[in-house]
Curated annotation (Swiss-Prot):
Chain's role: Molecular chaperone that promotes the maturation, structural maintenance and proper regulation of specific target proteins involved for instance in cell cycle control and signal transduction. Undergoes a functional cycle that is linked to its ATPase activity. This cycle probably induces conformational changes in the client proteins, thereby causing their activation. Interacts dynamically with various co-chaperones that modulate its substrate recognition, ATPase cycle and chaperone function. Required for piRNA biogenesis by facilitating loading of piRNAs into PIWI proteins.
Protein name (record): Heat shock protein 83
Self-association state and partner proteins as the record states: Homodimer. Interacts with shu.
Alphabetically ordered keywords of this record: ATP-binding, Chaperone, Cytoplasm, Nucleotide-binding, Stress response
Origin species: Drosophila miranda
């Protein structure tokens, strides 16, 4: 029997902030992606730091990355990281019931004319998701707890329940249900533009799932290895989605900053 979802009220200042974000017109809504990628990077930093003293922390997944998955059919943009993840109490406390010290300060700054893009400096960048989404789910798995899912369509409350869907291993998956008038944020070119503009200095791979076969830069040795794999698989081509590293495909066959030649090879997902 599935566990029932528990409902929690947003702390009053957080509810006010969300209302402000949802009901005010902001021109630079795109900063939501910068904030969510920044949070993902912080979560990756935390698990990497923990693994320095306890390598077994990475037994739940050694690869550290951020993945973006636009789905036009479902109208969702999903941001996945293999970072430290959140426990149930983290989801309840960090995403709604305990106001960060910056919540009130940011609202006051906004009302005094500050730009929405400053939201991350006040520690409440997560809520920028509601600039472009009318519903958000956050599925998370921390090494010290089971997998849980947080959900809210704003409106003053959120739910948290045990999650028995696809196991994450470790990390966090944020699904944004995009507002009908914001669907340009599901376009591959738009996502790449935002990532290259705001998140180019993130220290982890940012992978973008795309609907067609694309090219990805690799080293000569990797290219040779994967070329063999491709030859073995060339009769198996399908229209399945593919992954590419954001910002790599335009620089095919150029030397990288270390002077190494890179080739483009096709990577299947």
């Amino acid at each position: 029997m599935p566990e029932e979802a528990e409902t929690f009220a947003f702390q009053a200042e957080i509810a006010q902030l969300m209302s402000l974000i949802i009901n005010t017109f902001y021109s630079n809504k795109e900063i939501f992606l910068r904030e969510l990628i920044s949070n993902a990077s912080d979560a990756l930093d935390k698990i990497r730091y923990e693994s320095l003293t306890d390598p077994s922390k990475l037994d739940s997944g050694k690869e550290l990355y951020i993945k973006l998955i636009p789905n036009k059919t479902a109208g969702t943009l999903t941001i996945i990281d293999t970072g430290i993840g959140m426990t149930k109490s983290d989801l309840v406390n960090n995403l709604g019931t305990i106001a960060k010290s910056g919540t009130k300060a940011f609202m006051e700054a906004l009302q005094a004319g500050a730009d929405i893009s400053m939201i991350g400096q006040f520690g409440v960048g997560f809520y920028s998701a509601y600039l472009i989404a009318d519903r958000v789910t956050v599925t998370s798995k921390n090494n010290d707890d089971e997998q849980y899912v947080w959900e809210s369509s704003a409106g003053g409350s959120f739910t948290v329940k045990a999650d028995n869907s696809e196991p994450l291993g470790r990390g966090t998956k944020i699904x944004l249900y995009i507002k009908e008038d914001q669907t340009d944020y599901l376009e591959e070119s738009k996502i790449k533009e935002i990532v290259n503009k705001h998140s180019q200095f993130i220290g982890y791979p940012i992978k973008l799932l795309v609907e067609k076969e694309r090219e990805k830069e690799v080293s000569d040795d990797e290219a040779d290895d994967e070329k063999k794999d491709d030859e073995a698989k060339k009769d198996m081509d399908t229209d399945e989605p593919k992954i590419e590293d954001v910002g790599e495909d335009e620089d095919a066959d150029k030397k990288d900053k270390d002077g190494k030649k890179k080739k483009t090879i096709k990577e299947k997902y």
